[in-house]
């Protein structure tokens, strides 16, 4: 009887590993075909503005802010694996940090402390010009990542153009990113 019970428990464990949930974006699981995911995203109020190869681009509202959303899928378009949110560019460091801190706080309240976080500012001054210069040089680092059920969520401040930056949020479904890498 103990052996039978052990086998049942082991089978349940194996099945639960295979039944891992997919990460979701705005309530839409990040899986399935590009066509189906894009249709669901459109139903959430996003407007498709273009696509190329295995990436579709949308404009819309993300938590009350205008954003551009990129959806990534396998080369054949059969499986979506990631969603990236791009907020408007800014030449103001304070705007970038406020947006970053706002979303970092939201994700920390929802998922707990980030699994990884690096916020490095080599400039000892709070000068917009110096901080934007450092961002352009790649010496300022603001990024945080959470390991969540089904994948990872990352937020960062990225260089955008000559003297601008933008806040970027990346949703990556663990199973589908791994499957895409194996191809």
Predicted regions and their residues:
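Accessory recognition modules or surfaces
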Residues: 24, 29-34, 53-76
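Non-cytosolic coordination micro-motifs
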Residues: 20-53, 88-183
